[in-house]
A protein has these predicted regions:
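Short glycine-rich substrate-engagement loop in P-loop NTPases that contacts/grips substrate
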Residues: 81-88, 131-161
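Interdomain "pre-motor" coupling segment immediately N-terminal to P-loop NTPase/helicase cores
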Residues: 12-68
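N-terminal pre-Walker A segment at the start of P-loop NTPase domains
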Residues: 70-94
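Walker A/P-loop nucleotide-binding motif
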Residues: 100-116
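Residue-level preference for the first positions of well-ordered beta-strands
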Residues: 102-104, 131, 165
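Conserved catalytic network of the ASCE P-loop NTPase/AAA+ motor domain
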Residues: 95-98, 124-126, 158-161
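Post-Walker A helix-loop "phosphate-sensing" segment adjacent to the P-loop in P-loop NTPases
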Residues: 122-134
Length: 165
């Protein structure tokens, strides 16, 4: 779609570069039969999709996941693993987050608990919840270090209370 240079400058100045890119990606032949409202709607939908994808990627990166590529939708549900498809689908929906329910994993070493947890955190990030991955030994170390500082324990609690998961 053809946009004049002054409009491009204004969109960039307003930090709407994603919207500008979305307008530029629209094909003239595709948008010709559409009215202005439909063209703007297409461009905004396109820009919003890019915005949400970037936001999810930032949330996953900030979570510090051990396995950032983990995804509940692609977990192998082989019979011998004993994973219930319904339970995983329920966890992927994220209802437990709104209800403030806890999820606990138990199993032998190497059974995939960390991978499942990372997949759960990635799913929460897709739902735009803040998540943080920390191992218990690391958390215990942080608690011990915070205990030595004045106001340290309260600061540590505030830090982790900002995360939903």
């Amino acid at each position: 779609m053809i946009i004049d240079s002054e409009t491009k400058r204004k969109l960039r100045e307003m930090n709407a570069a994603e919207l500008l890119d979305a307008f530029e990606r629209l094909d003239e032949r595709t948008v010709m039969p559409l009215n202005h409202a439909e063209v703007v709607g297409l461009a905004v939908d396109n820009a919003y999709g890019g915005y949400t994808d970037a936001k999810i990627q930032r949330l996953v990166k900030r979570a510090g996941l051990r396995y950032p590529q983990a995804d509940l939708r692609t977990i192998d549900l082989a019979e011998e693993r004993g994973l219930d498809r319904g339970v995983l689908a329920g966890l992927d929906a994220g209802n437990y987050l709104g209800q403030r329910l806890n999820v606990a994993f138990q199993g032998a070493t190497g059974s995939g608990k960390s991978f499942l947890l990372c997949a759960l955190a990635e799913s929460a990030c897709r739902g735009r919840y803040r998540a943080c991955y920390i191992r218990m030994p690391d958390l215990a170390e942080q608690v011990a270090a915070a205990a030595l500082k004045p106001g340290g324990p309260a600061k540590l609690v505030r830090k982790y209370s900002t995360y939903t998961l």
